């Protein structure tokens, strides 16, 4: 048996996983991601050894309401935000629904990008030269309801993990809120861990 064939068999049996363009890795116990690093959903899916894909439900430049102005630290004159809704898939199975809001003044014409093909963070970093620095997250258990049942292909009242997050980055030399999102993960597909020390 060749080394290549042995690796192929271990991948097929679930002991190893491949990340395109990066290499082959040992799969840990369970499907889990850590909450310390700032990663995109695409990166989370890749880390678990799955092939990520995205479906854009809608993308619009809209008027910012009071809540979004507050969380994104926008002034009264900053009326426009970019709204983006997507479903993320792991090996063609829906695992996450995300609704994202960004201050349009920092990212003009961002609505022109095809977010079914490219990661939002990649666009922010490579096209708008943003350095993502930190994020604050709240985590809540919710029950699947309304459109989430269809988006994630789950039964009503199935538990989901909901994240509300504000992401910060350096824009024009200043650290500012660059993104607010709310997302829901299927709990049968994702686990998260937090490393703590004392």
Residues of each region from the PLM?
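N-terminal helix-turn-helix
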Residues: 1-26
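Short, cationic-aromatic polyanion-contact patches
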Residues: 25-38
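C-terminal all-alpha effector/ligand-binding and dimerization domain
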Residues: 51-198
């Amino acid at each position: 048996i060749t080394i290549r064939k042995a690796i192929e068999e271990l991948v097929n049996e679930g002991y190893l996983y491949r990340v395109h363009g990066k290499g082959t890795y040992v799969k840990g116990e369970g499907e889990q991601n850590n909450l310390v690093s700032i990663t995109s959903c695409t990166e989370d899916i890749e880390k678990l050894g799955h092939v990520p894909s995205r479906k854009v439900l809608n993308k619009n430049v809209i008027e910012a309401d009071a809540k979004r102005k507050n969380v994104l630290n926008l002034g009264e004159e900053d009326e426009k935000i970019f709204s983006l809704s997507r479903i993320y898939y792991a090996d063609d199975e829906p695992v996450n629904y995300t609704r994202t809001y960004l201050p349009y003044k920092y990212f003009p014409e961002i609505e022109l990008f095809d977010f079914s093909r490219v990661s939002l963070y990649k666009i922010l970093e490579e096209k708008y030269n943003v350095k993502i620095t930190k994020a604050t997250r709240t985590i809540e258990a919710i029950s699947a309801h309304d459109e989430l049942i269809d988006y994630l292909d789950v039964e009503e009242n199935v538990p989901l993990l909901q994240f509300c997050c504000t992401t910060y980055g350096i824009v024009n030399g200043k650290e500012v809120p660059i993104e607010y999102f709310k997302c829901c993960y299927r709990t049968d597909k994702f686990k998260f861990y937090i490393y703590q020390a004392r």
